[in-house]
């Protein structure tokens, strides 16, 4: 950092607040920018960028943009333009990259020239990815108080027919996500303008596209009138700019994903471009909890728990949600005392508006910590605070998972039934089937699972749930194998489905093939681990006379928070070894074309 300071480089107060400090209070030094990103240290990241030569920064067009955003956060728009190589004059800057020109339109808005910024935006935003140029214009129009023009933008972006995805793997989900963004913002703007009936009518377009989610949509539509759970503030220039930047970051991430998939690849590892973009956005709008949560989630997914906790704990104002996020990261990082303290603090500052959502997070973390008494004390309050059917269904769903974790399977099944009664969706039915299976009500569970398969024959996770149930809760191994083979065909890169299919092979005695498939599932999940995959590998290694590897896998399973009932069984295996006999090898079931028939569009 000293080299950058010597060259006249200065950080904004927002950036300085993100600095990770060593025990002596000095900023941590990093060997390369990626290390600073993984620590959630925007100050360290920008310092390394500033220390590069101009030629080095030009290797990535966003490096100068991030430094420019920090200058903008400090109120120095002239310094921001200097990093972008802009003069602020349209005639002088016309050869600059389109993204830089788009940034310049927002710099004009930050300077207070909103009408000029809007005109500039309309001139330069045509090359922005996807619909981000239009969304950005709508945000700028609203920040300028030109709400009717912003509404017209949203109207133009809304299609006449809205089609929801059939399942999680349906590519239509990408389109639906963009449409949902448009409709939600349209609806919220109308609500801010006091046009409640129109706001509800717009939002109902999403509800009509997903009739099975009627309970959740009804609660959301009602909140547009009551304001419950709705923090709907008018956009300012800074919050509008941050929103537009976030849209661009998401769109570019989606483009990278689609391009990789089209080339036969798979998205793996830490997305440093999205992380650096989001951390820079937080310089403009540090209080934006949605963007902050996205950064935390990205770091968490890559097992960068220290970085996730740091980002959660360095917000300008703390909140119960951020404390719960910090607690989760601290827990997974091995600091259980600090995690418990963060949970306690989150509950202590939660008010009536966020008490229910805080309880959701606190309960799940108490379960992972095996704090049974504390968890059971919170369940009645959770159920009492839930008011509308959507909240009550969610509360019963959480209660079911808590009781399930601690082995109270009958109580868990009862709450899962209540959740389904209140909110009869595919997700609730699948959770109920699992709870019934855990409670020994196998036939009732199978009725649900088979019905869901008939309704969603090309949903890989529905097939996975049925197939895995058949091989673990019944003796219908052959049928389970065939169902899982179809799931694999539809989602061959999904590690959880690969684990299930591998376990079907194990049950049929093909242990070597099972090992290879489940080991690949483990590798695909890295740097995360899953207790069930490790537990499966432990059993496989034991039967292959790899006793040390088996014990190591079971130990890893225990470190990754299995349910209590499974924890007891794994601990017994660690102590006494595996007592169940090696599965007898059987001929693998023949799979007909009918079993695997899948339309190409479904793949």
Regions found by a protein language model. Give the residues of each.
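Solenoid-like repeat scaffolds
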Residues: 16-25, 50-59, 85-95, 121-130, ...
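Generic helix N-cap/helix-start motif at coil->alpha-helix transitions
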Residues: 22-31, 56-66, 91-103, 127-136, ...
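Terminal, low-structured helical/coil segments at or just beyond the last alpha-helical repeat
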Residues: 232-251, 531-536, 543, 548-603
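Alpha-helical segment of the N-proximal tetratricopeptide repeat
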Residues: 2-11, 28-41, 241-277
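Register position in tetratricopeptide repeats
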Residues: 38, 73, 110-111, 143, ...
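TPR-repeat structural position
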Residues: 9-13, 42, 77, 114, ...
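Residue-level recognition of tetratricopeptide repeat
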Residues: 34, 69, 106, 139, ...
């Amino acid at each position: 950092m000293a080299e950058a300071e010597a060259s006249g480089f200065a950080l904004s107060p927002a950036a300085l607040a993100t600095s990770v400090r060593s025990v002596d209070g000095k900023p941590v030094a990093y060997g390369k920018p990626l290390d600073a990103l993984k620590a959630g240290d925007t100050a360290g990241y920008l310092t390394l960028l500033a220390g590069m030569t101009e030629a080095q920064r030009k290797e990535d067009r966003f490096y100068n943009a991030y430094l420019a955003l920090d200058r903008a956060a400090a109120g120095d728009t002239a310094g921001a333009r200097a990093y972008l190589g802009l003069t602020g004059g349209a005639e002088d800057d016309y050869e600059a990259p389109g993204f830089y020109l788009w940034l310049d339109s927002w710099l004009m808005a930050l300077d207070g020239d909103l009408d000029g910024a809007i005109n500039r935006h309309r001139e330069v935003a045509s090359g922005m990815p996807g619909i981000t140029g239009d969304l950005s214009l709508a945000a700028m129009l609203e920040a300028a108080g030109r709400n009717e023009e912003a509404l017209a933008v949203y109207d133009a972006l809304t299609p006449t027919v809205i089609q929801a995805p059939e399942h999680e793997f349906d590519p239509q989900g990408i389109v639906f996500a963009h449409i949902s963004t448009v409709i939600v913002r349209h609806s919220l703007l109308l609500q801010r303008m006091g046009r409640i009936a129109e706001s509800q009518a717009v939002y109902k377009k999403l509800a009509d596209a997903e009739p099975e989610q009627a309970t959740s949509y009804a609660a959301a539509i009602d909140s547009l009138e009551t304001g419950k759970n709705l923090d709907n503030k008018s956009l300012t220039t800074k919050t509008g700019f941050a929103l537009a930047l976030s849209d661009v970051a998401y769109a570019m991430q989606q483009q990278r994903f689609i391009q990789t998939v089209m080339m036969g690849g798979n998205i793996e590892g830490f997305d440093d471009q999205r992380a650096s973009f989001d951390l820079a956005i937080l310089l403009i709008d540090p209080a934006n909890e949605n963007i902050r949560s996205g950064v935390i989630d990205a770091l968490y997914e890559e097992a960068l728990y220290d970085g996730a906790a740091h980002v959660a704990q360095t917000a300008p104002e703390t909140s119960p949600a951020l404390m719960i996020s910090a607690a989760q990261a601290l827990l997974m990082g091995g600091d259980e005392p600090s995690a418990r303290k963060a949970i306690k603090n989150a509950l202590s500052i939660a008010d009536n508006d966020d008490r229910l959502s805080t309880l959701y997070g606190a309960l799940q973390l108490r379960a992972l910590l095996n704090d049974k008494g504390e968890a059971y004390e919170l369940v009645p309050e959770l159920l009492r605070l839930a008011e509308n059917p959507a909240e009550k269904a969610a509360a019963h769903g959480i209660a079911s998972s808590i009781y399930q974790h601690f082995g109270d399977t009958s109580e868990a099944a009862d709450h899962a039934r209540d959740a389904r009664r209140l909110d009869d969706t595919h997700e609730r039915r699948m959770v109920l089937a699992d709870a019934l299976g855990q409670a020994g009500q196998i036939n009732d569970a199978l009725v649900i699972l088979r019905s869901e398969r008939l309704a969603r024959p090309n949903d890989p996770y529905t097939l996975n749930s049925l197939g895995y149930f058949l091989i673990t809760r019944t003796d219908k191994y052959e049928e389970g194998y065939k169902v899982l083979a179809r799931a694999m065909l539809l989602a061959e890169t999904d590690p959880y489905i690969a684990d299930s299919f591998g376990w079907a092979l194990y049950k049929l005695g093909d242990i070597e093939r099972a090992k290879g498939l489940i080991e690949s599932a483990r590798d695909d999940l890295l740097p995360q681990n899953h207790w069930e995959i490790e537990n499966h590998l432990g059993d496989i290694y034991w039967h292959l006379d790899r006793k040390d590897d088996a014990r190591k896998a079971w130990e890893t399973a225990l470190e990754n928070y299995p349910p209590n009932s499974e924890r007891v069984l794994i601990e017994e295996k660690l102590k006494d070894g595996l007592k169940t006999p090696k599965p007898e090898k059987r001929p693998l079931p023949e799979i007909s074309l009918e079993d695997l028939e899948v339309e190409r569009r479904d793949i």
